Amino acid sequence: MGVYLSTPKTEKLSEDGENDKLKFGLSSMQGWRATMEDAHSALLDIDNDTSFFGVFDGHGGRVVAKFCAKYLHREVLRSEAYSAGDLGNAAHKAFFRMDEMMRGQRGWRELQALGDKINQISGMIEGLIWSPRGSDSNDQHDDWAFEEGPHSDFAGPTCGSTACVAIVRNSQLVVANAGDSRCVISRNGQAYNLSRDHKPELEAERERILKAGGYIQMGRVNGTINLSRAIGDIEFKQNKFLSPDKQMLTANPDINTVELCDDDDFLVLACDGIWDCMSSQQLVDFIHEHINTESSLSAVCERVLDRCLAPSTLGGEGCDNMTMILVQFKKPISQNKNVSPAEQSAADKQPTGDTHWSEIHVTEESSS
């Protein structure tokens, strides 16, 4: 089977949800691709005050994206930093934890189980939402103990995935990103990027890649992968003299924190199958055009997917898997400003970054 199908799979997996602070809609579609390698998480209430959303764009295979969709939010919850109110640090640790968990006999077994489940059912299962209601994903008692077995020396998967997640607690928004999936917020109709696309040609990324012994060819690390950060891809993380954040390819996420206000309209998380076809502002404008006329937020997402789908595979753009989550904030947001002293202290410790989204007040935790 080639990279593309003869006709696109346009069936969509969509869902909507709502609580007293926000509502969301999402949709995913395989499109022209021969396999569906996107995955996502949408959890309205991982605790009484906190929602979690994530998109994961797999490459070289699909199991790492599925693994992240199933386990990343669990590791956020399990973190001591999370208990202390430091959502950014909790997310930061969880990204690295994904690589650790996918090693050894236990990691091999979990990846095999996800792969078997995927292979036995149609490709649309790739968009499955892992939630406390639909799986055991809220079980925090598994300490991921070491297992003996024939795959005890398994170093990790050769395939990988981007990860872009948004954690909303009251009026605090924390975005963690590794790769080229993207998170965008609409404030008074203006699009602001809350993540940066990690590409090898970026100066800081290029410097790290070269120092780790890698090279860049045709915009790809070692001529292979067109991302500079991702979860998985163990073959690019083999320098034993370097820490995980210094490897030529790293899971190290950018962490950005935003104080939400009543000017904030909605939040979008999407894989590059969307961003290759529309700029951040174009997508925000498109959503504003349809959000008040469609019956649900997922219907808006479906419109976006249809808008991006190419009529043929000749042009390249519009031929990728597509996944999008749309989160709309309920007003007034100001009434949600119930931040504990521990949470405020954690946020205050994050330095303000000099970034391309600086017109909106963002605190950025350095990941270089």
Swiss-Prot record:
Principal EC category: hydrolase
Bias-annotated ranges (Basic and acidic residues): 356-368
Cofactor mode of binding and number, as noted: Binds 2 magnesium or manganese ions per subunit.
Disulfide topology: none
Single Gene Ontology BP annotation: signal transduction
Keyword Metal-binding: yes
EC number: 3.1.3.16
Record InterPro entries: PP2C, PP2C_BS, PPM-type-like_dom_sf, PPM-type_phosphatase-like_dom
Residues binding Mn(2+) 1, per UniProt: D57, G58
Catalytic activity of the protein: O-phospho-L-seryl-[protein] + H2O = L-seryl-[protein] + phosphate; O-phospho-L-threonyl-[protein] + H2O = L-threonyl-[protein] + phosphate
Binding positions for Mn(2+) 2 per the UniProt entry: D57, D272, D320
Alphabetically ordered keywords of this record: Hydrolase, Magnesium, Manganese, Metal-binding, Protein phosphatase
The keyword Iron is assigned to this record: no
UniProt xrefs under Pfam families: PP2C
CDD domains with a match to the protein in the record: PP2Cc
Family: Belongs to the PP2C family.
Name assigned to this protein: Probable protein phosphatase 2C 58
